[in-house]
């Protein structure tokens, strides 16, 4: 999309709110992966009456990013893409026909990353996203201020956002009295492509449940 890319999780969350307004959507379920999970979590806290369900896929807090990866994303984006594609997956050799005949997992990931980089010729969105993740410090407050049910979808072999790095958010959500569910899938950081059915079914089952009435803040 056009326009300036958000430079922080908070700015991106406000963009979500503006998008709901522009689309005339009064209430929505938010599903976010990685950086998107932080954005969805923050948006659910900022607009608690408008978010019915929150799904955090491949999340962690704090979501610290390796300084080497941040530097590479700015100075050598192609190198950073290779690093992410290696560490984001539990295997680069998908089981036969698991993702369709002839699927090239690494190549597809690289192609997608290059497309994202080309999507904004003014801003290096790759680097901007890493910095936003690394600097976000509002996780505990977001879990306290949000009210909707939360589902965590975590990859047991995730090296980018290890499951243990989400435990603080899980505990914060429970301490705030929110309904919390955790689904663990035996894959890496790309849950949507490495375990598409398990991820889809977890989302489906969670979203089909009617949200409990929101508690007053």
For each predicted feature, which ranges?
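Catalytic active-site module of serine/aspartate enzymes centered on a nucleophile-bearing elbow/loop
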Residues: 176-217
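Active-site loop/oxyanion-hole signature of alpha/beta-hydrolase fold enzymes
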Residues: 1-35, 201-205
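Active-site-adjacent alpha-helix of alpha/beta-hydrolase-fold enzymes
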Residues: 167-179
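Conserved alpha/beta-hydrolase catalytic His-Asp/Glu region
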Residues: 62-65, 71-147
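Conserved alpha/beta-hydrolase "acid-adjacent" motif
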Residues: 159-165
């Amino acid at each position: 999309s056009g326009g300036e890319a958000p430079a922080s999780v908070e700015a991106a969350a406000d963009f979500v709110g503006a998008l709901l307004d522009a689309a005339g959507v009064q209430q929505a379920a938010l599903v976010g992966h990685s950086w998107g999970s932080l954005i969805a979590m923050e948006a659910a806290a900022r607009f608690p009456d408008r978010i019915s369900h929150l799904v955090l896929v491949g999340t962690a807090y704090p979501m610290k990013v390796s300084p080497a990866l941040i530097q590479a994303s700015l100075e050598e984006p192609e190198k950073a893409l290779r690093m992410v594609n290696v560490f984001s997956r539990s295997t680069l050799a998908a089981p036969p026909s698991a993702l369709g005949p002839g699927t090239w997992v690494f190549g597809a990931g690289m192609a997608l990353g290059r497309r994202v980089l080309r999507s904004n010729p003014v801003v290096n969105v790759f680097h901007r996203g890493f910095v936003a993740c690394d600097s976000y410090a509002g996780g505990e407050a977001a879990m306290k201020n949000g009210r909707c049910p939360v589902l965590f979808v975590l990859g047991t072999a995730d090296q980018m956002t290890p499951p243990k790095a989400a435990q603080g958010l899980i505990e914060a959500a429970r301490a705030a009295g929110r309904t919390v569910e955790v689904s663990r899938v035996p894959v890496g950081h790309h849950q949507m492509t490495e375990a598409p059915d398990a991820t889809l079914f977890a989302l489906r089952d969670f979203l089909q449940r009617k949200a409990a009435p929101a508690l007053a803040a």
